[in-house]
């Protein structure tokens, strides 16, 4: 199943991979009955359709308890993914029902989807129920007439929780849809890592982070990619390869002719890997292979969104008498691959393949750039029949590469005719670079860097160059220009720079970007950007801006023109308010309101706003009444979010007569004179104890009343009485989030405040 899915998934249906099936059930055998499995599934359906799926079928309980009559035809038609949230065990999904025995009734052939089963016990491969649902799905069918799925992700434990499964579900699809992390292993790990962000307090032994890292498992190949649409196919452009030099040079393009960079390449023969690596930005890959007496090789190409590419290449015989039979590389560090800037010693072996002796030849060895020295006169001496000679060794240094991670060398005769072409693979430099200290506005500092060498390369006598590439900083030499540095493989070390950095009067919370260059022998061989963060020191400074440029100022930010003044606008008539429009909201309820003026938010104009009973609003309409507050940003949830106090707010029946006595009262008012629109949550009960009252409001300003440079409206959050008490449910979330949900400005989450934020 895995091989067919990877190599020829479209053989029987060209369109099945852009269809999906989502199954969900809101059920529990004790109160309360969860409602979020269907919410999560509605959200996922919309995200898949927005991503580009042509069709996403849904089978939900309620209303359907017998799910198999609907699930089986959908899978048989062909779907790329099957996603389940709800109630189940090793026997299968119970609401709606789809059990182990139902797998036998599938007839989907080679259209084998990936199953995502975020529900208890469905992947319990050690259960007395044998096979469990996951095993039945994977084992389904025969090698010639398959059925079921190609892979299955789900937990083995019987006691998983809805709130954690929802997060893992959301974070897995965030990784796959938004960050192109589509291999099963990394995608599942991304889902599990979501618990670290959304439930930071659940970090102890046996708590959620550890527990779900253990119980979620993959049946199937963890390196299998999930096709999220109809995949593209590779085209190969392969230059002839000859046995006299074994130099392989080819490129891969998409079906429309575009280069495909970072394609994972494997060169194989008879199951042995001869070479592996990634294509460069032009989709090109080069290597000199080591083999004897081979007649052909296989090239495999893998990249997300593509069917695995395969090409068989016949090794040609160019009737050359001389062959380049060996390339011997040695380095000062003793590593197999030379690092950039490292001295390399190389000796070539030339073999006479004929039965007659050869004459001496005057040649030149030429490197195609990025190598010093790059030209060597070499004499190939006369060679006896069927004998070899080792040429005198040469010494050089690579400061860059020609194609991918390799440099190209050629041996040419006196007429310029190329006798041999070869490639030398270089260790790719991979560094993490961070400033150790935070800068302060209007200060001068000599920065230290924490540098982590993530590669196997050794680097010695390296100078570090520092250049600002954003406004707000300048650098000057401090006289210690002779400082040199060494970087040991797979280790971190601190390094003093030879520069003084002068910071302007930049804002706290700003990021100043510098270019870090590594230089040796006067040649820069590595460059990378690093950010110096200007840390906010105390609560009386604004919270740093988000990606778009929103800052958060509160009334404790002394000396800033944008700092707001608290001036409560009461709309609830029971407490002296007037003119407000009243919305009586139920538990987990919302109302859509037309705003009195267009409001620009993150560069987009909106005319309506969804106001939710749980202390949040969104400019993009949202019919799902999310009550569990998440961090900002979080892929699942309302889009274009305003969260003045996102938390689970409740209605109650005080006397037990079955009728609600305390509603969630929301009011809105257009203050035309002052160009502002006010939305108040009045004395709403916190779901933590159903006693604590929360009163807060949003004020949106018209551009005519409070203009900004970008045209985006100013947003005020005001708090009359607030108690952030919900200790069992991540307290509250306060902040804003972009319409695309890929960034935001988080003021507080789970009682942890951003630098500069004042406690509510």
PLM region spans:
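Intrinsically disordered, low-complexity Pro/Gly/Ser/Thr-rich segments with frequent PxxP/GP/PP motifs
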Residues: 284-285, 372-401, 476-506
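Short beta-strand elements of extracellular/lumenal beta-sandwich folds
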Residues: 341-355, 442-457
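Short, solvent-exposed loop/linker segments at the N-terminal edge
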Residues: 240-245, 334-342, 437-444
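A recurrent domain-boundary module in secreted/ectodomain proteins
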Residues: 190-193, 203-242, 302-321, 416-424, ...
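Short acidic, flexible loop segments centered on an aromatic residue
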Residues: 264-270, 351-372, 452-474
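Cysteine-dependent hydrolase recognition
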Residues: 1-310
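Terminal connector regions
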Residues: 301-314, 396-431, 500-536
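Extracytoplasmic Ser/Thr/Pro-rich, glycosylation-prone low-complexity segments
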Residues: 22, 503-506, 533-760
């Amino acid at each position: 199943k895995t091989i067919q899915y990877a190599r020829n998934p479209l053989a029987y249906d060209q369109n099945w991979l852009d269809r999906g099936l989502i199954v969900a059930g809101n059920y529990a055998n004790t109160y309360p009955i969860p409602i979020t499995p269907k919410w999560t599934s509605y959200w996922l359906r919309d995200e898949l359709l927005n991503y580009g799926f042509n069709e996403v079928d849904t089978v939900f309980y309620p209303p359907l308890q017998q799910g198999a009559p609907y699930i089986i035809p959908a899978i048989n038609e062909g779907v790329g993914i099957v996603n389940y949230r709800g109630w189940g065990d090793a026997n299968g999904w119970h609401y709606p029902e789809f059990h182990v025995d139902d797998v036998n009734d599938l007839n989907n052939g080679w259209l084998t989807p990936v199953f995502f089963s975020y529900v208890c016990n469905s992947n319990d491969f050690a259960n007395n129920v044998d096979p469990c649902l996951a095993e039945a799905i994977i084992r389904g069918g025969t090698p010639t007439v398959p059925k079921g799925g190609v892979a299955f992700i789900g937990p083995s434990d019987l006691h998983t929780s809805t709130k954690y499964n929802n997060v893992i579900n959301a974070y897995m699809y965030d990784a796959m849809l938004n960050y192109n992390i589509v291999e099963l292993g990394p995608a599942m790990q991304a889902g599990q890592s979501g618990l670290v962000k959304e439930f930071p307090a659940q970090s102890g032994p046996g708590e959620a982070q550890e527990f779900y890292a253990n119980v979620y498992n993959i049946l199937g190949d963890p390196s299998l990619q999930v096709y999220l649409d109809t995949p593209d196919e590779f085209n190969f452009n392969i230059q002839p390869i000859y046995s006299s030099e074994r130099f392989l040079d080819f490129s891969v393009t998409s079906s429309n002719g575009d280069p495909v960079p970072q394609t994972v390449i494997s060169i194989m023969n008879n199951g042995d890997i001869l070479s592996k690596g990634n294509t460069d930005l032009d989709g090109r890959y080069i290597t000199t292979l080591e083999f004897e007496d081979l007649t052909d090789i296989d090239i495999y190409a893998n990249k997300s969104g593509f069917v695995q590419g395969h090409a068989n290449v016949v090794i040609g015989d160019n009737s050359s008498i001389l062959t380049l039979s060996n390339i011997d590389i040695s380095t000062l560090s003793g590593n197999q691959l030379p690092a950039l800037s490292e001295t390399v010693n190389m000796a070539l072996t030339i073999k006479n393949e004929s039965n007659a002796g050869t004459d001496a030849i005057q040649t030149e060895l030429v490197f195609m750039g990025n190598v010093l020295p790059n030209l060597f006169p070499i004499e190939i001496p006369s060679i006896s029949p069927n004998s070899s000679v080792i040429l005198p060794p040469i010494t050089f240094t690579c400061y860059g590469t020609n194609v991918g991670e390799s440099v190209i060398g050629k041996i040419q005769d006196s007429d310029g005719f190329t006798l041999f072409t070869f490639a030398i693979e270089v260790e790719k430099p991979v560094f993490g670079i961070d400033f150790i200290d935070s800068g302060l506005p209007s200060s001068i500092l000599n920065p230290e860097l924490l540098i982590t060498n993530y590669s196997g390369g050794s680097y010695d006598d390296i100078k570090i160059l520092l250049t600002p590439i954003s406004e707000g900083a300048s650098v000057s030499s401090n006289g210690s220009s002779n400082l040199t540095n060494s970087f040991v493989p797979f280790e971190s070390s601190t390094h003093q720079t030879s520069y003084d950095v002068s910071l302007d009067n930049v804002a706290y919370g700003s990021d100043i970007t510098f270019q870090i260059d590594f230089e040796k022998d006067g040649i820069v061989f590595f460059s990378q950007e690093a950010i110096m963060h200007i840390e906010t020191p105390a609560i009386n400074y604004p919270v740093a801006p988000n990606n778009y440029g929103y800052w958060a100022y509160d009334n404790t930010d002394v000396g800033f023109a944008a700092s707001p003044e608290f001036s409560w606008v009461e709309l609830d008539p029971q407490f002296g308010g007037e003119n407000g429009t009243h919305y009586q909201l139920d538990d987990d309820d919302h109302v859509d309101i037309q705003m009195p003026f267009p409001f620009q938010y993150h560069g987009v104009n909106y005319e309506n706003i969804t106001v939710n009973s749980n202390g949040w609003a969104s400019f993009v309409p949202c019919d799902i009444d999310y009550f569990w507050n998440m961090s900002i940003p979080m892929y699942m949830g309302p889009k274009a979010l305003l969260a003045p106090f996102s938390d689970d707010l409740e209605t109650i029946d005080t006397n037990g007569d079955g009728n609600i006595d305390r509603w969630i009262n929301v009011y809105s008012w257009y203050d035309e004179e002052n160009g502002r629109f006010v939305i108040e949550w009045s004395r709403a009960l916190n779901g933590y104890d159903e006693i604590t009252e929360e009163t807060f409001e949003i004020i949106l300003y018209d551009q005519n009343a409070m203009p900004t440079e970008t045209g985006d409206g100013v947003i005020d959050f005001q708090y009359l009485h607030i108690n952030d008490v919900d200790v069992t449910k991540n307290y509250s979330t306060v902040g804003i989030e972009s319409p695309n949900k890929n960034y935001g400005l988080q003021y507080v989450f789970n009682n942890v405040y951003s630098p500069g934020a004042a406690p509510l």
